[in-house]
Every structure is written in structure tokens, then in C-alpha cells.
A protein has these predicted regions:
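Aromatic-rich carbohydrate-recognition surfaces in CAZymes
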Residues: 55, 135-141, 145-236, 260-268, ...
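Short beta-strand elements bearing conserved aromatic residues within extracellular beta-rich modules
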Residues: 501, 584-587, 710-712
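Beta-strand-rich modules
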Residues: 602-622
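Extracytoplasmic
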Residues: 607, 625-781
Length: 781
């Protein structure tokens, strides 16, 4: 195609103002034309990337130059933030790696990432979370560091991570659901980020500083949040808006007892990272222990989360005494399972081809919750899409990698900034909460260039350069002025493919696929990578329209006199509300399927936990309903009950006393009170559950860090941990149940102790306070 017809084709494709007339002055022609190709690079049902322009419906965005993006996108009227329709470089980027490619839009999006990265560096050299979000957040900054800040902003990354260490020398779990840790437990991503900084910088003093913090935090978690199955309990990493990803009936205490795939995967990665730290520092025995723990957790993840019928890991377990799997696909956790080799090689391929991919990109999870607005639910987050793109490249999925790149580049171009999240139905930024200049979004933008197309991978003692270049992006691209452990790297990648044919450093050839020792990279290093330019073996992409799951049934237990009989529980009849579009209901007892019916009731003539799942005509299941138990329970009151509150740890004291307790009152507990003890009798051997009826008005349901934590002791032996999340500011009349601790017991008498131990220290440190009303004991089986 000649240059004239190239321009005409661009106009015909609707590029209009995105394309300027071409000049025809000899040797400059190719350079002038490289940003004006009408070739379609990527097309989905939602948008098209053509040349230097993104098209979506009537809107388009294009690169005027590598330092300017313009967009015609119009936002929703009345939304609290306007659409940025232009980005122009405002910061000096000369000290950062410089990209040159055969696509101007790619260069501009990368440069916008750098420009907004400079905006994110605060005067105290910490990394700001986003334009609308000041300060440092553990998970946000850690995920950003792993993607690209460890090598783009190593000093700010170090300072930011150290801001997230508390006075006890442990990693901070930021304020969150029910009072932070141990409801949310993804703070260990800090460990992975800290080790990534070491790999990028080789700074041994940094390693000596962070290793004790990592080890101390891991040991505390192992004593508190490990489930009987050897999995880590707690909220799904980063997806921390409760009803945005969990059934509405689940309280924060229920979330604290769930086992989330993504959180477990990052924890296994953290254990491996800490083991590597220990090994480098000569702590061989500790390294071996950590490696063994990582291996055991990896085995548990593969045993309990893998869904053969889906070809990927389920999202989380949920319920009360009998957990079931939420079979949704959760993209970040799946991506991490590939990137950190938690999934074996064959499962990595399966995940790559089976995780659903919508026209706008990979969902946070799939399918969506039908009666929830867009934020984590029904959303695309570019930082998650970036991790998924890295994982697709590692798995060798060319089409998946291209669609991943597009899912990040489309919104970056159309909105002329790195926003946090987008509605998965229409690709718009109208969600429950959003921000421009988001740290993890821009970090992911940069990582697509550096980690995928240039294939930069940091090892503990060197650099592995292994690009993955889809055929649609073939050509020559350079990344100059890349700093690595004091050396300046100028990297050129030629061609396309999944494999390197030849790699040279200052003219000296190195074996493709092998780590280049750090000691060989000194001064200025010109690295040239020639790809093999062979077709990448085709792999499937599980392209799916965005899908909404049916609403959750509401259930209740009643007495049906016709079902009464010896051994039959009083509440012997399970009922639920009819849902119009449900084709059948599944009835579960103790987490197992016992019946399918089109009716809205079922005889519950055996004691147990009962739930219902609705299945719509497409075969899509709802969440399981809240477990309803008709097992008999024994209730114990505490000794020395009262009605007053006097602890110095008390926050938000009630104005007119406490109401809603049973018996003569309640007992008040804090870090200094003596253990509460109750003598109980177990009449029959079996599995028993222990729970506390409690109140905690020290903070709101959705934030702060004052969850109360206590240890269950039976005859002097530790048997589990009680978690008592915040239930609302000053809500001392709102009594709820703690988690249930299952213990196998033989018949006999026991002394129950509820005590505060060092591992019960919460994130607030100073306030670990609650009111206790009852101890509830049930025979589970």
C-alpha cells in the first residue's frame, strides 16, 4: 500500500482528526509514516486499536505525538469527575527509560505512565496512591512496586514500604472490613514487593532491614489465620468492599473465616520470597522451613481450590461450619498463580485459556453479582488486567496477551489518564468510586512495556531478558537508559515471537533464556535481542459476554407439625422466597447437595446447616443462601456479668448504657483483663463448635483497625482464635456472633478459657476491646 492509499484507508476507517497529512521527503518518509498505519492491531466486540488510534463506538483517542494524547470521549453527565480529553507531558522524563517503537500510541501511553508516576512521588518521597487518594496503602504500593516501581522508583518504593511497618515491627494491614486484620490478611504482598526491590537493586542492606519484618509478620499470621486445612483465612486480596464480592448475608466475621484463592496464592509467593531472603542472608534452617511452608500451602491451594470442570481455581470458600466453593473466576489470583508458579505448568495453560475474557477485558471476577453496582463487581481494573497480561505472556497465549494489552491501552488512551476502574458493561469510568493518576494503574501500564515486550525479569543474582512479542506488534523497539544495579542498559528488541533467537550484550553473545549475571552488567550496556520470528502456537481465549448471576435466595426455618417426630429438630422445614427467573433450586445440607427442586420449601428433618442455591435457565448459579442451623445449642453465661463499661481501651462509649444483652449483663474484655473461664460438660464425643455472642462498637463495619481477637483454650491447650470485628461506631446494642471454632472432643468436662495472647495483637495495638454476652456450644457432627 502506498502512502497516499494508506492515508485514504485511515480516513475511510473513521480516524479523521487522528491522522495528519503525510510529508514526502525521502529518507524521513518511513519515520513520518510509522504512526499512520491503517493496520488493525487489535479488534474486539467493544473497541478497535488501529494504527495510533483507539476507536470505541462514536469516540476515538489518538497519539498526536509520543508526548500528547487526545480523546473525544464524553463522560456521563453529572458524574463527580470530568473526562480528561488531553494528556500532555508536563514532567522531565529524561532520567527514566526512553521507549522508541513503531507505534506512536504505544509510546504515548508509556510516556503518560512515566509522567503520572512522577506526579505520584510525594515531597516525602513516598508513592501517592492516586490523584484522589493521598498516602500509602500496603496492598496498592506493593502491587505497584512488583509491576514496575521497584526499578522505576526504587528509593520511593523502599520508603513507602517502610511507612507500612507498625511499632511492633510488623507489616500493617490497612484499615478495612470489620477492623482490618485478621478479616483482611493480604498484607503479605509487602514481602513479595520487598524482595522484588532487592532483585532489582541488589541492595543487601535493604534485605537485612526487611527480612526480620517479613519473618515476624509471617509467624504471627501462622499462629492466627491458618485454617485447619492448611489454608490462609481472610478476605480476597484487594477486593475489600464486602457485598461487592460476597453474598449480602456474609458479615465481616464470615469473611474472616473464608479462604480466598488470591490471598493464599500471594501468601505462598510471600513464603517463597522470604525463604529466598533467608537463604541470601545465610539463614539456611529458616529458609528450609519457609520453603517447606510454601510447598505445603501450594499443595493445599492445588488440592482445595482447583475446579476440574472450570479449568481454573475457584475464588473463595464460604459458609459457616461447612464451607463451599464460590466457583467464580478471580483474575488477579489466577494471574498470580501463573506468575509465581503456584499452578503447575499444565494448569497454567488451562487457566490462560479458561478464565473468561469480556469484550473490554478480564473482569475482576466472573460472573458478576446482578444486584450490585460497579466497583469491584462488574468492573475492569487496569492493574489487574496488567497482571493478567503478564500471566498470559508467561503462559504463551498470544491472543490473550494482545487482548490484555488492549484492555489497558484502551482506557488509558480514551480517558487520557491512568484511572483505577471501569464499568464492564460499557467501558465507562462511571463506578462507585474512581480516581485519575492511580499508582497501580500506571505501574501496570509501564510493566506491559518493560516486562512483556522487553521481557525484563529480575533474578536474585542477575537479569533474564525474555520478551514476548505478538505478531501484531512485530518490529523494532528500544528501551534506552534503563538503570539496573548501577548499570545503564540500552535494550533493543527486533522482530516478534515467544522465543529469543539471539541476545548480545555489548556485542558478546549470551545463551537465550539464561540469566545474565549482574556482575557482567557494568557501565553502559547495549543489549540487542533478536526474536525468532516464528509463529506462536495458537491458544484459546475464553471470550464471553459480560454475565450477571442470579440473586441469592432468602431462606428461613420453621416448624411443620406434620414433620414432627423423635429426633426431628423443632425447626424442621426450610422455606425460601421464589425468584422469577430461577429454573431450579439446589438444597444443601452441611455443604453437600441433597436435593434439586422447583418448589420453594424442603423438609429439614435432620439437624444441620441448610442452604439453597438458585440456578437460572442459562445454568448460572446464585450464591448459596445464609446457612440456617437447626442443631441444638447449649448456651453458657459468663461469671461476674455487669452492665457498666470502664476499660481505658473503650472507644465511642454509649450515651445511655448498653442494651440487648441476655442474662444479668455482660463481661468487658481488653488486653489487660484476666481470661474468662467457663466450665462445660460434653455429653457425647464428636465435633463441637464454639462461638461468642459479642458487641464491638469501637469502629465502623467498613474501616479502621479495632477488631477484637482472643484465643480459645480448652483445659489449658490452644484450640483456635476468636475474631470479633467492629459492628459500627458506638453500636454497643448490636450484638453479633464471633466465628465458630470447630474442635473434636471426647465426652467429659472441660474448662473453656478466653484469653489474650501476643498473637492476638491487632493492627490498632492499643484497643483490643469487646463485650461478651454468651458462649454458644453446638454439636456439629
Amino acid at each position: 500500500m502506498n502512502l497516499h492509499s494508506l492515508y485514504i484507508a485511515a480516513i475511510a476507517a473513521g480516524a479523521g482528526a487522528a491522522f495528519a497529512p503525510l510529508t514526502m521527503n525521502g529518507a524521513d518518509t518511513v519515520a513520518e509514516a510509522r504512526g499512520f498505519s491503517s493496520d488493525v492491531i487489535l479488534s474486539t466486540d467493544a473497541y478497535r486499536w488501529q494504527g495510533d488510534t483507539i476507536f470505541q463506538n462514536e469516540f476515538k483517542a489518538w497519539a498526536v505525538s509520543p508526548e500528547e494524547i487526545r480523546s473525544t470521549y464524553k463522560g456521563r453527565p453529572g458524574y463527580f469527575m470530568p473526562v480528561e480529553q488531553t494528556w500532555k507531558r508536563k514532567n522531565d522524563l529524561s532520567s527514566y527509560p526512553r521507549l522508541t517503537s513503531n507505534n506512536k500510541l504505544h509510546e504515548a501511553i508509556y510516556n503518560m505512565g512515566l509522567d503520572e508516576m512522577v506526579n505520584a512521588v510525594e515531597p516525602d518521597t513516598t508513592l501517592r496512591t492516586g490523584k484522589e487518594w493521598a498516602g500509602v496503602w500496603t496492598r496498592d504500593v506493593s502491587y505497584s512496586i512488583i509491576l514496575s516501581m521497584c526499578y522505576m522508583q526504587p528509593e520511593a518504593s523502599m520508603i513507602s514500604l517502610m511507612k507500612k511497618v507498625n511499632p511492633s515491627g510488623q507489616i500493617i494491614q490497612d484499615t478495612g472490613s470489620g477492623g482490618a486484620w485478621p478479616i483482611s490478611t493480604d498484607r503479605m504482598i509487602w514481602v513479595v514487593a520487598a524482595y522484588e526491590i532487592y532483585k532489582a537493586t541488589g541492595d543487601r542492606q535493604w534485605l537485612e532491614k526487611v527480612y526480620p519484618i517479613a519473618l515476624r509478620s509471617i509467624r504471627k499470621d501462622m499462629a492466627t489465620v491458618m485454617s485447619p486445612r492448611g489454608l490462609i483465612k481472610g478476605e480476597t486480596s484487594f477486593i475489600d468492599w464486602r457485598e461487592q464480592s460476597y453474598p449480602k448475608w456474609m458479615q465481616t466475621v464470615d469473611i474472616s473465616q473464608s479462604e480466598a484463592m488470591g490471598t493464599n496464592v500471594l501468601y505462598a509467593a510471600a513464603l517463597n520470597a522470604c525463604a529466598q531472603m533467608a537463604d541470601i542472608l545465610g539463614q539456611r534452617k529458616e529458609a528450609a522451613r519457609l520453603k517447606a511452608d510454601a510447598g505445603a500451602l501450594t499443595d493445599a491451594i492445588n488440592k482445595y481450590f482447583w475446579l476440574d470442570d472450570k479449568g481454573y481455581y475457584g475464588m473463595y470458600t464460604y459458609g459457616r461450619d461447612h464451607k463451599i466453593m464460590n466457583p467464580r473466576a478471580e483474575t488477579l489470583g489466577l494471574a498470580l498463580s501463573i506468575l509465581y508458579d503456584i499452578a503447575p505448568a499444565e494448569r497454567q495453560k488451562s487457566i490462560s485459556t479458561n478464565n473468561p475474557h469480556t469484550p473490554y477485558g478480564p473482569a475482576i471476577f466472573y460472573p458478576q453479582i446482578s444486584d450490585m453496582p460497579s466497583y469491584h463487581n462488574n468492573a475492569l481494573w487496569p492493574f489487574v488486567a496488567s497482571y493478567w497480561t503478564l500471566a498470559q505472556a508467561k503462559a504463551g497465549n498470544e491472543a490473550g496477551t494482545m487482548e490484555g494489552i488492549g484492555s489497558v491501552f484502551r482506557p488509558a488512551a480514551l480517558f487520557a489518564t491512568n484511572k483505577e476502574n471501569f464499568n464492564l458493561d460499557n467501558g465507562d469510568y462511571y463506578t462507585e468510586l474512581n480516581s485519575s493518576n492511580m499508582l497501580w494503574s500506571l505501574a501496570g501500564n509501564i510493566a506491559i512495556t518493560t516486562r512483556v515486550l522487553f521481557g525484563i525479569h529480575f533474578e536474585k543474582d542477575g537479569l533474564l531478558i525474555s520478551p514476548f512479542v505478538p505478531k501484531a506488534l512485530e518490529g523494532t523497539r528500544t528501551l534506552d537508559n534503563f538503570n539496573y544495579r548501577g548499570a545503564t542498559l540500552n535494550i533493543t528488541v527486533n522482530g516478534y515471537g515467544a522465543n529469543v533467537a539471539k541476545i548480545t550484550v555489548n556485542g558478546k553473545e549470551y545463551a537465550p533464556g539464561k540469566t545474565i549475571p549482574a556482575k557482567r552488567l557494568k557501565g553502559v550496556c547495549d543489549i540487542v535481542v533478536d526474536m525468532d520470528c516464528k509463529p506462536i502456537p495458537a491458544m484459546d481465549v475464553n471470550r464471553r459476554p459480560n454475565l450477571k448471576a442470579p440473586v441469592t435466595p432468602q431462606t428461613w426455618l420453621t416448624n411443620n407439625p406434620a414433620l414432627n417426630g423423635e429426633g426431628v429438630p423443632v425447626n424442621n422445614y426450610l422455606e425460601w422466597n421464589p425468584i422469577e427467573y430461577i429454573s431450579k433450586y439446589q438444597v444443601l445440607k452441611n455443604g453437600l447437595l441433597v436435593a434439586e427442586t422447583r418448589e420453594t420449601s424442603w423438609p429439614a428433618t435432620e439437624p444441620g446447616e441448610w442452604q439453597v442455591i438458585g440456578i437460572d435457565a442459562r445454568g448460572v448459579p446464585s450464591f448459596a443462601s445464609e446457612p440456617r442451623s437447626n442443631r441444638p445449642a447449649t448456651i453458657y453465661q459468663f461469671k461476674n456479668e455487669g452492665t457498666g463499661m470502664k476499660s481505658p481501651e473503650l472507644c465511642n462509649a454509649p450515651a445511655d448504657g448498653v442494651k440487648g444483652y441476655t442474662g444479668q449483663g455482660f463481661v468487658e474484655i481488653d488486653r489487660t483483663t484476666d481470661p474468662e473461664t467457663i466450665n462445660i460438660k460434653i455429653p457425647q464425643s464428636g465435633m463441637y463448635t464454639f462461638a461468642l455472642r459479642y458487641a464491638n462498637g469501637n469502629g465502623p463495619v467498613n474501616t479502621e483497625n479495632k477488631a477484637a481477637i482472643r484465643t480459645l483454650m480448652l483445659n489449658g491447650s490452644k484450640r483456635g482464635t476468636f475474631v470479633m470485628p467492629q459492628r459500627g461506631v458506638g453500636n454497643w446494642d448490636d450484638w453479633g456472633m464471633s466465628n465458630r471454632i470447630q474442635v473434636p472432643l471426647t465426652a467429659g468436662t472441660y474448662t473453656v478459657g478466653i484469653t489474650y495472647r501476643p498473637e492476638n495483637e491487632n493492627m490498632n495495638i492499643n484497643t483490643n476491646h469487646a463485650l461478651l454476652d454468651q458462649l454458644v456450644v453446638e454439636k456439629a457432627k
